[in-house]
Amino acid sequence: MRRAVVIGTGSALPRRQVSNAELARTVDTSDEWIVERTGIRNRYVAGEGETTSTLATEAARKAIEAAGIAPSDIGLIILATATPDQTFPASATMVQAALGIGDCVAFDVQAVCSGFLYALSVADSMIRGGSATHALVIGAETFSRILDWEDRTTCVLFGDGAGAVVLKAEEGGDRGVLATRLHADGRHNQLLYVDGGPSTTQTVGKLRMKGQEVFRHAVTNLAQVLREVMGDAGLTVDDIDWVVPHQANRRILDATARKLGLPAERVIVTVDQHANTSAASVPLALDVAVRDGRIKPGDLLVLEAMGGGFTWGAAAIRY
């Protein structure tokens, strides 16, 4: 069976770190308030010259280097982002150009915080179908540029960053993407959204969120989709070595783990240092755990996320 195997990971963060204490100097909040409600202590904010595509390119370079291949080997680039450099062209094509990659398939996917899972699923399908051999899948965001910095209920939650994986088609063996599951429910599109856009206000807009409603749906949906994808893979929750979740809020991570009966020590947590980086959060957390040695070859991983729309999804991967 032809499978998409993860052969390299990479990540990138802006130069500037912003602690809760620094944020509290300009926003009506405090370190204690943020930590108690979210678990977040730090985030990274893009500065001059740093964009979604530059962060994506840096993460991609590291993933390609880790994979031990040349950029020219990449035949497919999918970039998940809700904060592209421009309305068009796709930021994936900017990454392609920056990496010096010639003719290939390159496009963006937009499913907000679950965008990386959507992009991974598409890449997996294309590899299984034979239309790609090496794929670069990236999640990258600069949410700092769509935040209302006077709204303490949202601006404290988000950060900027990028994460990337290189997938390679391999025949036989038990490594690779075992199963993916995706969902969307547009009835809830006004619970987490940006109040602007080219065809409506002709502005970028600012992020708006009804936090308690999002929390309630997130815990239920994430637990559900994790069970679904494990069933699709013919495995159980007990088989999981590591869950790599979307890093939205420490309380969501803890509540989801409890609902599934998962020990907290099997959940990769980076939200304290990176905050919510939307589509970047899953590949960013994955890269951190690969590079610090927690995730090892042969481990069974479940990646999961939920974002605005609502959209949500999960992937079971034998690393």
Swiss-Prot record:
Pathway annotation from the record: Lipid metabolism; fatty acid biosynthesis
Stretches for region ACP-binding: 247-251
A Pfam family per the record: ACP_syn_III_C
Q: Which InterPro entries match?
A: ACP_syn_III_C, ACP_syn_III_N, FabH, Thiolase-like
Question: Could you tell me which HAMAP family the record lists for this protein?
Answer: FabH
Tell me the function of this protein. Catalyzes the condensation reaction of fatty acid synthesis by the addition to an acyl acceptor of two carbons from malonyl-ACP. Catalyzes the first condensation reaction which initiates fatty acid synthesis and may therefore play a role in governing the total rate of fatty acid production. Possesses both acetoacetyl-ACP synthase and acetyl transacylase activities. Its substrate specificity determines the biosynthesis of branched-chain and/or straight-chain of fatty acids.
What UniProt notes about the protein's domains is:
The last Arg residue of the ACP-binding site is essential for the weak association between ACP/AcpP and FabH.
Quaternary structure (record): Homodimer.
Listed name of the protein: Beta-ketoacyl-[acyl-carrier-protein] synthase III
Q: What is the lineage of its organism?
A: Bacteria, Pseudomonadati, Pseudomonadota, Alphaproteobacteria, Sphingomonadales
